[in-house]
């Protein structure tokens, strides 16, 4: 099966999984993804239950041309992961059906709902989204293979 950008499907996902398994990799489950995203915190976002409106947020703030740093949400969390920092980007997780976490494809932002509701899909507590049409967008959807430590005694 050839990989065609913009046409990632459940079948494409199934195509990659055996190769990852041979390398000791797999996709996180939705619960594992939420734990990784939250950095072990029990709040709505890794930094607390509200949105700090002084943060520089992608899609709402432009960086000055001389600034060579990531947007605030792109900074690594307590686990050192840059995860769930862009509401347009969704991560495929391991599930019985094609499921994503970490974004809504930008629906809330494009719908004009503002920064808080725009970034709410990036919360580790946002419900995983089953992709009913079994299709993913190659520009916004991606995989984060993980190594399960239980595999290494």
Question: Could you tell me what each predicted segment is?
Answer:
Residues 140-152:
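Short, structured beta-strand segments at or near domain termini in extracellular proteins/domains
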Residues 28, 134, 139, 143:
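Single, functionally critical "micro-switch" positions that shape active/binding sites
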Residues 94-136:
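Alpha-helix capping/hinge segments and adjacent helical runs
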Residues 1-112:
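Functional-site microenvironments in short loops/helix caps that host divalent-cation chemistry
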Residues 18, 132-137, 151-153:
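Cysteine-nucleophile amide-bond enzymes
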